[in-house]
Amino acid sequence: MKIRNSLKSLRGRHRDNQLVRRKGRVYVINKTQKRYKARQG
């Protein structure tokens, strides 16, 4: 999982990416391509 300051550019890398908020953190998840996971930090 990548940890980045800005997730907007990472979300645009694949069309199945989703921006999700869990427990006060922001994540990018992708159910078809698991390698696109990222967390904001």
Curated annotation (Swiss-Prot):
One of its GO terms (cellular component) is ribosome. SUPFAM superfamilies: Ribosomal protein L36 (SSF57840). Coiled coil: none annotated. One of its GO terms (molecular function) is structural constituent of ribosome. One of its GO terms (biological process) is translation. Keywords: Ribonucleoprotein, Ribosomal protein. The keyword Ribosomal protein applies. Residues 1-21 are annotated as: Disordered. Belongs to the bacterial ribosomal protein bL36 family. This is Large ribosomal subunit protein bL36.
